[in-house]
Amino acid sequence: MEKTIYVNRPASRTWNRLGVNEAAVHWDTDAEALLSNEGFTAVSGENAPLRIEAADGGAAYGRRVYTVTAEAGAELTVFEVCTAAQPLAAELRLTAAEGAHLRVVQLLNPTRGAVLRHELSAQLAEHAKLDLISLQLGDGAVYADHQISLAGDGAALRVDLGYLARRSDTADIDLTVEQLGKSTVSEIHASGALMERAKKVFRGTIDFKRGSAGSVGSENEIVLLLGEDAENKTVPVILCAEENVEGSHGATIGELDADTLFYFASRGIDRAAAEAILARAAVERLARMAEDE
């Protein structure tokens, strides 16, 4: 039987009245069944990309778990595609050993009315690197929880996240980066568009732990509101337990203004077409970065 569970809790809570301390999801925990649990290991000198396709398999409340390990000096690109017509939970566990480089291209794409829960965890050792490109383009509800630890000195992370939410869809994202090692670097870029009655929450937390001296972290989000009833909540947070660090965050939220509409109209493009063009532009940069159809 379905009950309410709470996911995407940030590292630091804020006022409850803001409605961003957690996401409530209707989920049948008793019916949840493990559909697959697979592991992959990359070694230095092997560069063939790994493709993961996580689907519901026709079962409601299925769960799929994937563990990817990059050994010292290895380089690996992972393409992960999650599709769901039924409620689906997927988990991707990443480990990068010393000097390893992981590049993850992720597409979260539920069909209309479906619920997709996705969890990503990553542990980066000394001088390891993770590049994450995450696209959320589905027609249903996506709850994405990314927990990344820069544990080793000199570990580096870049995240490029894009979303497009329409109708009454939900995009709920929690991204927490713990910077533990010395001279670690994190860089987060998020952008997307909300149409009609769509709702989006993005919680981006950079957490400088004691001992992370010399580390740098930044996050930025650009949101385009294309629906009068669209609802956006952006929660950038920087936590600091170390003095010699540098952190920054920012957000830009814009709408389709009269000047932009006039520009499109003068070229024979009506409002609906203009919104479609701008919504596509909000995420197509990431699609080009993905380098995979």
Regions found by a protein language model. Name each.
Residues I277, A281-A282:
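Mid-to-C-terminal alpha-helical segments outside catalytic/metal-binding sites
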